[in-house]
Structures are given as C-alpha cells and as structure tokens.
Amino acid sequence: MTQHSRDTPQFYLTAPSPCPYLPGRHERKVFTHLVGNKAGELNDLLTHGGFRRSQSIAYRPACDQCRSCVSVRVIANEFRASRNQRKILARNADIVGEQRNPVPTSEQYSVFRAYLDQRHRHGGMADMTVLDYAMMVEDSHVETRIIEYRKRTLDTGITGRGGDLVAAALTDVLNDGLSMVYSFYEPGEQNRSLGTFMILDHIARARRLGLPYVYLGYWIEGSKKMDYKGRYLPQQRLAPSGWIRVDASGEYPEPQD
C-alpha cells in the first residue's frame, strides 16, 4: 500500500446533500486536509483557487449542475465605502477591535451561542456545543487570528482594552489578504449592523497590513443569506477564466491575475 506524505494533499468528493442556500438544489463539495508543514502554503494556494477553510479542512463547491457559488474578494486599496456603509462606521465609532491568538473563551461562546439561537437556529451549526466551538477556533494549522470587537470604555485609551464583547471574527492571514472564516455578533446589537462593520474593519486592516484583498467566501446571486457580499466594490469574482473585476457599475472588465 502506498503511504502518502502528510504534505501531499489528497482530494475527496462528498455525496450529494440538500443545498442550504438555494431551495430544491443539492450540493457536493471537494475537500482536502490542511495538515503538515506546508498547510499554510496550501491554504494560500487553495484560497486563491476558490476554496474555503473550516478547521483543518479546505473545501469548495463541486455541484453537478450548478455554479451559483462564486468566490469573491474585495480590492482593499480601491474600496470606497458607500453612504450607508459610512453611516455604519460612524454608528460603531465606539467599538474597538482587538486582534488575538485563536484561543476560545466562554465570553466568545456566549455571544456565538446567542447569535446562532437568534439568527441560525435551524442551520447546520445550530447544535454546536462549547467543545465544538473550541475546535472551530483552535483546529487550525495555518496563520489564524480571532478579532474581538468590544465597546470602548473610559480606560480604553490607557489600557487598549475594550469593555463588553459584542462581536468576533475568525480570520486567516494569507500571503495576499485576509480571509474571513467565520464571524458572529451579539443579536441584541442588531441596529449596529455589526456584520457589515466587521467586513469594513477587515478591509481597513488589510490596507494597514499592505495586503491587497479581503476574501469573503461565496457570493450567491439570489440568495438572501449570501447576496450581501456583492455590495463591497470594487471586488473580484472567480470565474472559469480567472478572477474577474467587478466595479461599482457592475461591469466585468478583463480578468485579473
């Protein structure tokens, strides 16, 4: 029997299952394990090719008769916030983002649990326990951070620490950008539009780090759950011919390297 190296990726295909985004359709995924010394390099390469990471697994849709899931990445240096997005930034001027190592806490899980119960109670993650959450955060062989968003306090300017946790984002640092793996927020703060705010904050962070892109995962036209990702322009969308730029007018110029 041939023994495969841990650094040599092996790809697998899942059986069909109901699509969680488009009613009446079925999904399949191709996936591989991100392990070994080259896990970071492989994650970079696969993300550029439209894969997403979940713990130590990299996956992408491989549906038989559907190509609706389109990988998108925001062009950070060219992004200009819309009027509504600027209002959201102003509304959250009292929020401080703190980058941390991927260490799960009970405070994070409390917000995560409330988020699932309010926003995704019938979703595939609805039954996640505190141990499941810990695995989601810790089980990474690539450069991963968790960014906590807290309310500013009187001592924040001195200590650099915020107060109550209102949101968090699990984020991979790639060679050409930031990849938002999963984000969640306190549902009682829904008037803040914290999901949008975290994306805007990641775009600003990518700029400061000199990274060209923020990877948002899959945009699905016609899906209420995923259509919002098309609002961050200009962006690039992965087509069979490569990454295609989409500007503010919705036009599709030449492929991008």
From Swiss-Prot:
Q: Main localization of the protein?
A: cytoplasm
Q: What is its EC number?
A: 2.3.2.29
Which reactions are catalysed by this chain? N-terminal L-glutamyl-[protein] + L-leucyl-tRNA(Leu) = N-terminal L-leucyl-L-glutamyl-[protein] + tRNA(Leu) + H(+); N-terminal L-aspartyl-[protein] + L-leucyl-tRNA(Leu) = N-terminal L-leucyl-L-aspartyl-[protein] + tRNA(Leu) + H(+)
**Cytoplasm: present as a keyword of the record?**
yes
The subcellular location is: Cytoplasm
Q: Name one GO cellular component term.
A: cytoplasm
Q: Name one GO molecular function term.
A: arginyl-tRNA--protein transferase activity
| Record has ATP-binding as a keyword | no
Recorded hits in InterPro entries, A to Z, give: Acyl_CoA_acyltransferase, Asp_Glu_LeuTrfase, N-end_Aminoacyl_Trfase, N-end_Aminoacyl_Trfase_C, N-end_Aminoacyl_Trfase_N
> What are the UniProt keywords, alphabetically?
Acyltransferase, Cytoplasm, Transferase
What family is reported? Belongs to the R-transferase family. Bpt subfamily.
Q: What does this protein do?
A: Functions in the N-end rule pathway of protein degradation where it conjugates Leu from its aminoacyl-tRNA to the N-termini of proteins containing an N-terminal aspartate or glutamate.
Protein name (Swiss-Prot/TrEMBL): Aspartate/glutamate leucyltransferase
User: What's the source species for this entry?
Assistant: Rhodopseudomonas palustris (strain BisB5)
